[in-house]
Amino acid sequence: MNNNENQNKKINQAVILAGGIGTRLKPYTDTMPKPLYPINNIPFIDYLIHQIKSFEIYNVLILLGYLPEKITNYLGDGSRHGVNITYDIAPLNYETGARLKHAISKIYDKFLLLYCDNYCPIDYSKLLNDFCNNNSKIQITAYSNRDNYTKSNLKLEKDGRVAKYDKRREEANLYGVDIGYALVDKSVVLSIPEKNCNFESEVYPQLVKKGEIFATITEHRYYSVGSFERIQLTEEFFKTKKVVFLDRDGTINKRPLKACYVERPEEFEWLPGAIEAIKLLKKNGFLIFIITNQPGVARGNLTKEILYSIHQKMHNELLEEGVDVDDIFYCPHNWNEGCFCRKPNPGMLFEAQKKYSLDLSKSYFIGDDERDIEAGMKGGCKCRMVDRENTILDIVKEIVALEK
């Protein structure tokens, strides 16, 4: 892609909807606006501004209504955060559609629209590519909601086109949740009627009819300050964690011959440097998770009980060295079962992500096979491959140095 094409794709403004009262956060919001709710002693909006900056977007327009001076006094012109922040203050009773319409003169031709209470480490480059390739008026980000984390409000076609948007979340067979992070063409804002209306309820159904709204799906759980029920998970997510995922066979232990498996504990044999690598990670405060395909379970070569005993041997030998891994995730399915967990699918990574409130975009995946790397990339991890030139210990030393 040449520089002109890159420039044409670049989005230069983020718009944050931040005008609501935040009723579900009372009594905090009796005196403070929701975006300033402290998560680990940092106002939530700081995390959003930092993320926007990581997308190389440096112009931020914040749409305010409730206690606007609290936010303007705190953020100022944005220079402290390395961005340029401007504001549009509309009447308190304005809904999101009217709030966007009120700010029309300040909105760029194309912009990133965010909710002030949601955070997700999205793949922004994919979102942007989808927006351009689909020629959509709006490209929203949708959480897949495989785990029924909340009620879905979308129905999607296979190509990502939004077939139904249900603000009330009442219809059957919905799949996916709109979490914001929408790339928007300004023409959509111009089409908002001159009345006090909700942006999504008013505009999305019209775009659905025209086939002009698409979704980029993320499997990564999103985090929120929308209600107190979500706060604890959000606080856990934003705690600093250093994380490494390790493949098993061929990465930390000797790989069996093709189509063969480690079928007994005595067949599990550590690769040179693997235990030392795990000790080095633990010494430097990393969480360590094993991610392994074990189709031998489906094929009858070993039972789950035997697999457990193999992993127990691994645990015991690590404990003798004064360390251990934090958890093991395995896929017991055969290659043709169509599961989401078997690598190169990233299901085990997202299972770990949800269980431990991890940020996969800040995590590493080390494997010895292209399927490992593909799974890690689908999960948004930083990937490293063990090969003849790079042992697991070499790679771990590099990661430890990078994360100091």
Please annotate each region the language model reported.
Residues 63, 274, 278-314, 325-334, ...:
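Substrate-recognition element of Asp-dependent hydrolases with the DxDx(T/V) motif
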Residues 242-287:
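Active-site neighborhood of HAD-like aspartate-dependent phosphohydrolases
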Residues 36, 253-272, 297-302, 306, ...:
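Metal-dependent phosphoesterase signature
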Residues 72, 78-158:
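Conserved beta-loop-beta/alpha segment of the NTase-like Rossmann-fold superfamily
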Residues 111-112, 119, 125-132, 145-148, ...:
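Catalytic-core segments of class I nucleotidyltransferases/pyrophosphorylases
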Residues 7-71, 272:
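N-terminal glycine-rich phosphate-binding loop and ensuing alpha1 helix
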Residues 45, 71, 103, 117, ...:
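Residue-level signal for inorganic ion chemistry
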Residues 305, 309-326, 334-365, 369-404:
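Asp-based, Mg2+/Mn2+-dependent phosphohydrolase catalytic module
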